[in-house]
């Protein structure tokens, strides 16, 4: 059972979250829950107040979608991201090889300086999903257009080469340009707003989706995708945070939710060390509603997403929702009731438990994480009697500057 925490705990946690910018700059906060939902109009248009602060959920001022704590840049809102529209229309040249990197960076710099304050210290999430930076990852009808367009580009640029050589030019040209676009964009963001946490939404990918595999579903990431993630060393080295998606697939049976989420996060932890002396923070994206039905996540769903993220030692989660959750007064009240009755109490419980475990087991110098990732019943939860417990199922992931089994040893 998850205890419904009282007013004292709510007020105490709220006081901890007053200076949210400072909180995001300091990794020594065990687990953060951020709000990336366009809910501002619930208050401004319909008069429905969503008490996010009191529930321990970090939001932008006025609950705006873009702000000082989290900003997400979509494909058509940032720089000159090249892609093909649903009708085959090429935007910004369509493929990375066709766009001017200098022009892209100039426009991106203007947008960063305009949209993010000079003291920005939140999450800066780039949502570029149309193509994958490695050639082999662009399969399926939606992404094969990038291979075809790249081959056409190579035929035009290198007409004297034979088809095999042109195909090689298409592949290398695509991958080099894609890398330059993504890598330089991250470097630019970190140069202009160095206190922000910059990364790409959905990366690293895992490829463990549900394909009606029934009893042989393991949740493991696809071996080919693990290999590609290893090849993307440059992307992890250029990032300052990782934002994998743990959206629950519509047809995935609930019995497999935990293993689905666990393997996605474990792959993120694996690449988080690449090119860095200390692991990158991992903040997983959680969708508030089920895509197929629009239903809010149940308490069990929250345990298998937010709860598993906390128990594995993630830095936090980002809650995402679309405009439908604030489309009317009725929908806003539905969101309000869900926040107050289900989501909020669970967030308070997990963040309080993560802090307690950090202090009791890791001397406040690390995050608690499962000793055995397969230990499916152990969660960072406070019990109804408020017994914080010994957290025997958890080990420590030490913060920068600390080491040892309980993070008690200073590390230069």
Curated annotation (Swiss-Prot):
Its EC number is 3.2.1.35. Residues 353-408 form the EGF-like domain. It is an enzyme of class 3 (hydrolase). InterPro entries: Aldolase_TIM, EGF-like_dom, Glycoside_hydrolase_SF, Hyaluronidase, Hyaluronidase-3. It is found in: Secreted; Cell membrane; Cytoplasmic vesicle, Secretory vesicle, Acrosome; Endoplasmic reticulum. Keywords: Cell membrane, Cytoplasmic vesicle, Disulfide bond, EGF-like domain, Endoplasmic reticulum, Endosome, Fertilization, Glycoprotein, Glycosidase, Hydrolase, Membrane, Secreted, Signal. The active site is at 129 (proton donor). Glycans are attached at residues 69, 216. It catalyses: Random hydrolysis of (1->4)-linkages between N-acetyl-beta-D-glucosamine and D-glucuronate residues in hyaluronate. GO terms for cellular component: acrosomal membrane; acrosomal vesicle; cytoplasmic vesicle; early endosome; endoplasmic reticulum; extracellular region; lysosome; plasma membrane. Residues 1-22 form the signal peptide. GO terms for biological process: carbohydrate metabolic process; cartilage development; cellular response to interleukin-1; cellular response to tumor necrosis factor; cellular response to UV-B; hyaluronan catabolic process; inflammatory response; negative regulation of ovarian follicle development. N-glycosylated. Coiled coil: none annotated. One of its GO terms (molecular function) is hyaluronoglucuronidase activity. Disulfide bonds join 42-332, 206-221, 357-368, 362-396, 398-407. Facilitates sperm penetration into the layer of cumulus cells surrounding the egg by digesting hyaluronic acid. Involved in induction of the acrosome reaction in the sperm. Involved in follicular atresia, the breakdown of immature ovarian follicles that are not selected to ovulate. Induces ovarian granulosa cell apoptosis, possibly via apoptotic signaling pathway involving CASP8 and CASP3 activation, and poly(ADP-ribose) polymerase (PARP) cleavage. Has no hyaluronidase activity in embryonic fibroblasts in vitro. Has no hyaluronidase activity in granulosa cells in vitro. Belongs to the glycosyl hydrolase 56 family. This is Hyaluronidase-3. It comes from Rattus norvegicus.
């Amino acid at each position: 059972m998850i205890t419904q925490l009282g007013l004292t705990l709510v007020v105490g946690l709220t006081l901890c979250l007053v200076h949210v910018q400072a909180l995001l700059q300091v990794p020594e906060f065990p687990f953060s829950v951020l709000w990336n939902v366009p809910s501002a109009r619930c208050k401004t248009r319909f008069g429905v107040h969503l008490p996010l602060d009191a529930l321990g959920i970090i939001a932008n001022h006025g609950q705006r979608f873009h702000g000082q704590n989290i900003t997400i840049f979509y494909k058509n809102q940032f720089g000159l991201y090249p892609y093909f529209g649903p009708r085959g229309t090429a935007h910004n040249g369509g493929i990375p090889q066709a766009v001017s990197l200098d022009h892209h960076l100039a426009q991106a710099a203007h947008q960063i300086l305009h949209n993010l304050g000079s003291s920005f210290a939140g999450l800066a999430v780039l949502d570029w999903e149309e193509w994958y930076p490695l050639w082999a990852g662009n399969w399926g009808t939606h992404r094969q257009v990038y291979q075809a367009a790249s081959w056409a580009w190579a035929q035009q640029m290198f007409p004297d080469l034979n088809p095999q050589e042109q195909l090689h030019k298409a592949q290398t040209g695509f991958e080099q340009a894609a890398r330059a676009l993504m890598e330089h964009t991250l470097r630019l963001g970190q140069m202009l707003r160095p206190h922000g946490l910059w990364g790409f939404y959905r990366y690293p990918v895992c490829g463990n989706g549900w394909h009606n595999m029934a009893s042989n579903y393991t949740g493991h990431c696809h071996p080919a995708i693990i290999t590609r993630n290893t090849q993307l060393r440059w992307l992890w080295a250029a990032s300052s945070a990782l934002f994998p998606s743990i959206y629950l697939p519509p047809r995935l049976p609930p019995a497999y939710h935990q293993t689905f989420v666990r393997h996605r996060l474990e792959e993120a932890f694996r690449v988080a060390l690449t090119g860095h002396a200390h692991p990158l923070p991992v903040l997983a994206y959680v969708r508030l509603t089920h895509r197929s039905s629009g239903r809010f996540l149940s308490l069990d769903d929250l345990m298998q997403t937010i709860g598993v993220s906390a128990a594995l030692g993630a830095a936090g989660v980002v809650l995402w929702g679309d405009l439908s959750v604030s489309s009317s007064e009725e929908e806003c009240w539905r969101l309000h009731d869900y926040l107050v009755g289900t989501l909020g109490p669970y967030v308070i419980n997990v963040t309080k438990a993560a802090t307690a475990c950090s202090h009791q087991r890791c001397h406040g110098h690390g995050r608690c994480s499962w000793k055995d990732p397969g230990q499916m019943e152990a969660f960072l939860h406070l019990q109804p009697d408020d017994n914080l417990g010994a957290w025997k199922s958890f080990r420590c992931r030490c913060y920068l500057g600390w080491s040892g089994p309980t993070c008690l040893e200073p590390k230069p």
